[in-house]
């Protein structure tokens, strides 16, 4: 699962959504460029025996997921708003979109990807004009970002039986109105699951390992990976 189509961008490879069938790669990419089939295995010492090993290594091989330091992924650390936005942006291969919006509290390694994600309609800032990149992302906001990403990729996001789907979560009344449609869609699509307690836990956080599982399911739902 470490082989994928990649696009040569400058002097580095970026993920090109692609599926393989009997040795043939079908690439879903918005635009032209130089593409190659690349085997790029990645491993992290602290996921060797972790349940997320395949998801983490699969996304890392495509330069979507990334460690916190060389060889260290920290799967049980909570994922931040910046980290999740960057993973979605790279997963959809939209790193070349022109990002022109700069949040006053966004700078550093994730600045370009976050600006790109905003321009693509995947993320929004808060009312005060900030993004709060280092905050732990809430599960309800992950659902909103995922649906925005699916919409960007061409999916029509509608849920006819929203109340019926949400009723399966015992805490469904605590899901904010702005996120209810997104939570229902992600649950129905099997992209974001509820907790073992039958809660959705909308204000709860997710680990970096859980984030890779969600991104991987999103990519399979879009038929962007095998």
Task: List the predicted regions and their residue ranges.
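Alpha-helical membrane segments in multi-pass integral membrane proteins
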Residues: 176-188
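Proteolytic processing hotspots in large secreted/extracellular or virion-associated proteins
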Residues: 1-4, 9
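Aromatic sugar-binding surface patches on proteins
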Residues: 23
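Feature responds to low-complexity, polar/acidic, surface-exposed segments characteristic
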Residues: 10-20, 28-54, 61, 66-113, ...
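Short, hydrophobic-biased amphipathic alpha-helical segments
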Residues: 207-214
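Surface-exposed charge patches
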Residues: 6, 57, 115, 184
């Amino acid at each position: 699962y470490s082989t994928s189509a990649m696009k040569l961008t400058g002097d580095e490879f970026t993920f090109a959504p692609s599926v393989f069938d009997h040795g043939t790669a079908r690439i879903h990419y918005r635009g032209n460029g130089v593409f190659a089939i690349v085997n790029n295995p990645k491993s992290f010492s602290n996921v060797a025996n972790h349940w997320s090993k395949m998801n983490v290594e699969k996304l890392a091989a495509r330069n979507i997921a990334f460690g916190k330091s060389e060889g260290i992924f920290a799967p049980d650390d909570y994922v931040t708003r910046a980290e999740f936005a960057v993973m979605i942006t790279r997963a959809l291969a939209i790193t070349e979109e022109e990002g022109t919006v700069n949040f006053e509290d966004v700078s550093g390694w994730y600045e370009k990807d976050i600006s790109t994600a905003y321009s693509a309609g995947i993320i929004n800032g808060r009312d005060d004009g900030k993004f709060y990149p280092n905050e732990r992302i809430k599960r309800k906001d992950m659902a909103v970002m995922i649906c925005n990403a699916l919409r960007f990729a061409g999916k029509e996001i509608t849920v006819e039986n929203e109340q019926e789907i949400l009723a399966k979560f015992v805490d469904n009344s605590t899901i904010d109105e702005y996120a209810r449609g997104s939570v229902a869609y992600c649950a129905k699509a099997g992209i974001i699951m509820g907790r073992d307690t039958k809660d959705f836990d909308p204000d709860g956080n997710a680990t970096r390992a859980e984030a890779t599982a969600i991104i991987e399911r999103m990519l399979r739902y879009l038929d962007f990976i095998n």
